[in-house]
Each structure stands twice: as C-alpha cells, then as structure tokens.
C-alpha cells in the first residue's frame, strides 16, 4: 500500500502532476545487455548476475545500433493526480469476496516511504484485517522485488494457495 495522504497535499500534488505532464518522462537506454543487468542489480543487490541477465532479456530490447531500451511506458513515472485515500481503498477491500493471498518480503523497504517500522507494521496489519478472507505469507531472503529474488518460493505459495 501507499502512505496515508491528507487533503492539504492536493494543491502541490496537482501542481507536480501538471509539471510532469508538461515535461514527459523518458526511459533511459543502456549500451549493452550487461549494462541493463548491472542496473537491475544496482536496484536489487539480492539479484544474482545470472538472474539479472535473464531479466535483462525480458525487460529491455536492443535497437539496430545495439543500444538496449527498457520495454516500459515512461508515463508510469508520472505522479498520480489523485491522492491515495486509504479509507476509500479499505472500503473497497472490505467488499472482496475471493480469497486473497497477501505476500510480504522479509527485507521489504516499505518503511522508507511509509514511516517508522513499528507504526507501519501496525498500519499494514490494520489494512490487511479488513479483507474478509486473507492468508498471509512471508518470503525469506527477499526484498521489494520478491518475484525476482525468490521466484520459486513465490510460485510455490501461489500454487498452494490456488489448490486450497
């Protein structure tokens, strides 16, 4: 989830959003497949060199000159004009009728943007409790990109969840 917001943040958020629309973002290119892998590992030191190369082949493509370009939409870098209204989100979550698998990473960095660990842990637990049928799991030795860090462990959790 995202950090709570307050209405007083709206004017600056709209200004930031409009500024970012005026100056559209772009995706950086890289000189080689190995440079893409290095960039992935810079963001995620748990990523093995082999897995980083594998992901590079799926995350970026080379052009005719040999430069590698990330296959992402640069617009995802633009801040949302709308504030994250936690209570509205939770009202929606209360209406979920399907079972939910909530997976967390042992080395998450959610504390960096949501606040002190003890407070955030309590807030995450509060949010999770509104989901009528939720099963939680923790993946060891994984961070924010847990699907990159421990894909086999995540796949096992999902498979077990789906057959229950």
Stretches found by the model and what they are:
Residues 1-33:
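Flexible "cap/lid" loop of the alpha/beta hydrolase fold
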Residues 4, 109, 144-147:
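Nucleotide-sugar-dependent glycosyltransferase donor-binding/catalytic pocket residues
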Residues 28-115:
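Alpha/beta-hydrolase
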Residues 94-142:
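Conserved loop-alpha-helix segment in the C-terminal half of the alpha/beta-hydrolase fold
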Residues 154, 158, 162:
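Hydrophobic "lid"/C-terminal helical patch
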